[in-house]
Amino acid sequence: MTDLTSLTLAEARDGLAAKSFSSLQLTDAHLAAIEAARVLNAFVLETPDQARSMAKAADAKIAKGEGGPLEGLPLGIKDLFATSGVRTTACSKILDDFTPPYESTVTSQLWRDGAVLLGKLNNDEFAMGSSNETSCFGPVVNPWRREGSDAKLVPGGSSGGSASAVAAGLCLGATATDTGGSIRQPAAFTGTVGIKPTYGRCSRWGIVAFASSLDQAGPIARTVRDSAILLRSMAGYDAKDTTSVDRAVPDYEAAVGRSVKGMKIGIPKEYRIGGMPAEIEALWKQGADWLKAAGAELVEVSLPHTKYALPAYYIVAPAEASSNLARYDGVRYGARVNGRNITEMYENTRAQGFGAEVIRRIMIGTYVLSAGYYDAYYLRAQKVRTLIKRDFEECFAKGVSAILTPATPSAAFGIGEKGGADPVEMYLNDIFTVTVNMAGLPGIAVPAGRDSQGLPLGLQLIGRPFDEETLFSLGEVIEQAAGRFTAAKWWI
């Protein structure tokens, strides 16, 4: 039998339908792969008993011809999604052994469609990070290595566990979240596909909040088709989320393979940043050439406020985080560190419960919202955000179907290599991705090549609001031209 962990999600779905193997066999293969790859630290909680139980139930449904769109397919869930009866910590000590009595909307829709839970995936603490090094469970290791080196690399963040697990063949797909690039950057670092849908496309209910006006759930998978299949199950209106949009969910998979002839693809001049490696520039041109060869028209566009996006993002996101994280105080749930009085208990709990990066962002957020600085920082950042959104609107109004950019300014870097002395060095990793969140647009990262050391590099496509279908069509063109990327399993 084929190695079941090497299958794409679409291939596994078709194999189950053809009864080539059972969901239990598929699930057991992935559970064994997870056990063998613990050195990657991708999973923070494994749920083998629950997985096998769900797989058996799926097999019974498939036998009766009653299977859902994801029936029997084993997935990993980022530890930001509440899973009823299964520990959910956001990879923070402050949530300790918190076990929610409720299910997030996104995961409940995955279970509704028949998916199998393999366990919870590592992420940066409260999704704050670009390398998955801030987790209280320790850093995640990228399954990719530089040629001729055994140095451990980061998988990107904050959804590093999701990207690492998918790239290593530990699950067929994974949920992730994206506040400033946390789906697309890890996907680019690991040779996987990640899509951040339009803001409001997937419900945020039951997902631990970082920055509520920026957070959006999406999938990380091995192929564009797999991402499309997963997004269809994850998306949909939810009355429990006031920012959820009541709009029909299309058949995203049908867009994969659709012709892109005649589409206008914008190439934004502002994304040619100083110091960008020649390899990234060459990859960007290669991607544009592939789309042109498929019949698309390339046009240079201007997004003049791009240069202000990163500083504005690092004002807006911490401001929202400082408000959202005020609820963690040791009173009702999570960790509690006692003190001589209630105020000291709050202080002790938060000081010991939150990690250094989370504390830094809470402090930045509190500072920019304080009386003397609100107008100078937060209000200005929100005005910049409006201008960034307007840049995209004007671009799309000229008939541009999508915008092509690099996904990251570099390939994956070493664990402990960046941000130690200067956190801004780490924040610069988000330079190509934050504009998408600030404008609430959909963006997809697709593997497009490798650097001189053999590490995967990705390209990003940015779409019009609620036009994820065009991104899947264009993404598949790049995927077909570039081929698929698979990491060698050095950990076995």
Swiss-Prot record:
It catalyses: L-glutamyl-tRNA(Gln) + L-glutamine + ATP + H2O = L-glutaminyl-tRNA(Gln) + L-glutamate + ADP + phosphate + H(+). Its EC number is 6.3.5.7. It holds the Pfam family Amidase. It comes from the Bacteria. Keywords: ATP-binding, Ligase, Nucleotide-binding, Protein biosynthesis. The keyword Transmembrane helix does not apply. GO terms for biological process: translation. The active site is at K78, S158, S182. InterPro entries: Amidase (IPR000120), Amidase_CS (IPR020556), Amidase_dom (IPR023631), AS_sf (IPR036928), GatA (IPR004412). Allows the formation of correctly charged Gln-tRNA(Gln) through the transamidation of misacylated Glu-tRNA(Gln) in organisms which lack glutaminyl-tRNA synthetase. The reaction takes place in the presence of glutamine and ATP through an activated gamma-phospho-Glu-tRNA(Gln). Heterotrimer of A, B and C subunits. PANTHER family: GLUTAMYL-TRNA(GLN) AMIDOTRANSFERASE SUBUNIT A (PTHR11895:SF151), TRANSAMIDASE (PTHR11895). Belongs to the amidase family. GatA subfamily. This is Glutamyl-tRNA(Gln) amidotransferase subunit A. It comes from Rhodopseudomonas palustris (strain BisB18).
